[in-house]
Structure formats: structure tokens, C-alpha cells
Amino acid sequence: MSLNTQRVSKFPFPKRDAKEREGNFEEVQLPYTLEEAMAEASRCVTCGNPVCIDVCPLQLDVRGMCEAVARGDMATAYHRIRETNALIGTTSRCCPQLDSLCEKACVVGSQGEPVAIGMIQRFVSDWERNVSRQPDPKTLKSTGMSVGIVGGGPAGLAAAELLKRYGHSVTIYEELPVLGGTAWYGIPDYHLPKDVLQYEASRIVDMGVRIKTGVRVGKDIGLYDLGSDHDALLIATGAKDVSKFDTPGSDLKGVYDGYRFLEDVFAGGVEKYLEHPTYDLGKRVLVIGGGDSALDCARTALRLTRGEVTIVYRRTEVEMPVDEILIEEGKEEGLKLKFLLAPKAYVGEGGRVTKTTMTVMKLGEVDASGRRSPVPTGETIDMGCDSVIVAIGRGPNTFLQKATGMATGPKGAVAIDENRMTSLQGVFAAGDVVTGESLVVKAMAQGREAAQRIHEYLLKIGKEHISLYDYYFTRRTSGRYYTGMLDGKEETLPPA
């Protein structure tokens, strides 16, 4: 087989021109055509041991998807990846495939450009949503058991979907008026359009999952009261606790919390925000931080102000825990980056910030994060600004832990055992409330694992754990991996 070492479009994917993105919240990434998707999928060499699947937290059947798309069979491709991923379009857009997951592991990439797995996955999800809606996944007969899930973000949605397929009654309790969690209010529309996430969440609801929005468990209803209504509970409340602002001047007008900023701009729809903007950013914006949220805040501020936006990070670009592609997109849009600087004080006039005094840093020894640690040099510089957006870290949501007294770990994260059960009997936990801020796909994988353990707990299967990725509702041939259609039929496993 001859190896096609280049993608069908400009690497890494087609996207809007930078000039077109000015003040524009439409999706930056442009979709493949049918011909492009089929041609790109045909670049897959169908490895006997697909590493791309192994590195995917959801064990997405990349090989089966590519084989099906290459021959134009989008329905089969959809069902292959829908088997373990209920948010196909969402993850295709927000996963760092090329930076750390499937595309980085693609063997084709060792000889050239890796197969554009995310773009192919996106094409399949868009096809299903816009062209040919596919049937809901099959579910097993009712077990008569009920599970309550606190939190309707990626972890909660993934868990709800799998538990429903196992035949359990499922109710999600969500504090916000919409489902999606951080994926809804924390990821800008130009990266993840709201209609994509809304559609995929609605498909889970269509399976029979009950939804109660506007309910804050621990305040509107107690966790123990909720426990009396269900046979098991899952805590999936995400990461919402913002690092404390202790820099002098943090109380000045114009100094904003980055996570609240993203939530206020996007949670109710960016169109509504643009009609009634609530942030006075001015034309010179500093964004403090070097992670995904800092980059999202900066690129959002660029679109809102069309001014000068600068990310200030205490390490260098090499240490930024962000997909390089997104950094490049920001630079294309005019984003500036300053490194080896950390805020020492916010200085203002008349109660409003006008400049930030920065401590100049240097890199020291490698710390626990695996990166070289920033060390103050003692030197300072001033940077003028009209506003500052601080996005320097978000820990697990600790509200329920404090309300119930359940055991916690570092930074107030929910402590769990090997079965993902908390210190409260029958109460499990998954996602960012356990790990702190992480990837959407990793939160989903934890949600599915928790669903599996809850299923075992309810049916008293014991500790003979079924490997989550060897136990499918649709059988895969050739060991763990699907290599062809089973006469167009899905096979349902008997109840465990």
C-alpha cells in the first residue's frame, strides 16, 4: 500500500481567514466536503493494533470510522464512533487530537501528516445532525433501578447515556438552565457552536433520561434527600472554584475573573451578550494565565474589543498547556503574548485599573507539573491596560463536599475508591470534581467508567469488573476492534 503523507487540505485543517474572524464568533474551523472526508479517511492504513484507539480516553473506533467513511458509508461510521461517544461533534471540535491524543499517535504521522481524525469525526457528526438522523442506541430492558446524577456536563451526560443503555432509570439534576456544563459556558462559540452541543445533549434526553434544570443540589434539595429517591447517585459537578485573587489591586474595577467572563459572554448566547454587554474592557486588555481558559478569554476579548489583547504568562510558550494550533490561531487574529512575567500588583486611578506591575521571572528547576518552575528575578516592569482578565486556574467544585462532609482530596476534590465510590455509600463521583479542570473527553471517560461501576453496584456483580472497553452493545470483530459491518445489524448483549 502506498502511503499518502499529506492531508487533503492545508495542514492542519481548513479554517476562516484571520481577517474574517475579526468580531466574528462563527466557527473558525471549516468542514470537509464529502469528497474530502472520504479521501482523508482513505489515508488510514487500518493498523492491526491501532494506537490511535488506545490513546483515546473513550477508545473511539477510529479504524472502523475511517474504513466506513472511505467507502462512503456514513451511517456505519456514525454507529462505530457513537458506541462509546455520545458527544461526537463536541469532542471532534474540542479534543486536542494533534497535540496529545489520536492524531499525535497516528502511525501515518511518522512519515508525514497524520490522518485528520478529528475532521473526519466532525464530518460524520455533522452528516448525522444535518442530513440523516440515526436511530437512538438500543437499551436493555428496565432493571427497575434508579440513578440520580448531579451535574449535566460532559461527565454527567456520558454517564447518563450508558446507564440508560443498561436499562436504569436516570435523572440529571443541573444547576444551570441548560445542559453541557463547562462545554456550554466555558468553550467559546467560535470553537464549539452551541447548536452542536445542544443537539447532542438532546439526543441523550431523547433516550429517556429525565432532566431537572435550575436545581442546585445541596441548596434546593439535600443530597441525602436525593438519595432517598434513587438507588445510587453520581456527583459530576465539575470544576468551578476559582483560585483566590490575592494580588494587590484585585478589587479594582476592570479586573475580572476569566471563568465568570466566559460564562457571562457565552452561557446565555453570545448574541444576547452583544445586545447588552456587561464588561467594560476598553482597548488594552491583559489576560493573566497560560492555559486553555486564558487563551479562550483572550480570543474572546479580541472579538469584543477589536483592540490590543495580550496574554501574560509566567513561563514561556513551550510550557503553555495549550494545543499549539490554538496558539497559532490566536496569533493569526492579532493576539500578543508576553512571557516570564507574573502580576505583582494592579494599579489604578479613580478606583479603576490603569496598569499592572509585573515581576520578571526566569525558569528554574522542573517542578511537580513536569515543567520548569518560574522563579522571580526581583526585577519589575509596568504594563498599561484598560482591563485585566485573570484566568489562572480552576479547582473542583467543592460546594457539595462542604455541604455533606464527604471525604475530600487535594484542593477539595471528591475522594473516591477504586470503584469511583465516595465516602458515602452508594454515592459515586466522576469528572473534574475529582480531578480538577481537565479535557472534555477525559471527563466523559470518567463518567462512563462511573456508570459501569454503578451498574455493577446496583446489580451486585461484585468486584469482577467488566472492562469498560471490552463490553460493547454492538460487537466488534477481530478482538477489540471493528473491521467490517455485521450485515448492517447491531447485536445487543444480554444483561450482565
List PLM regions with ranges.
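Beta1/beta-strand and adjacent pyrophosphate-binding region of the FAD-binding site
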Residues: 142-155, 280-288
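FAD-site-proximal beta/loop scaffold in flavoenzymes
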Residues: 251-282, 366-437
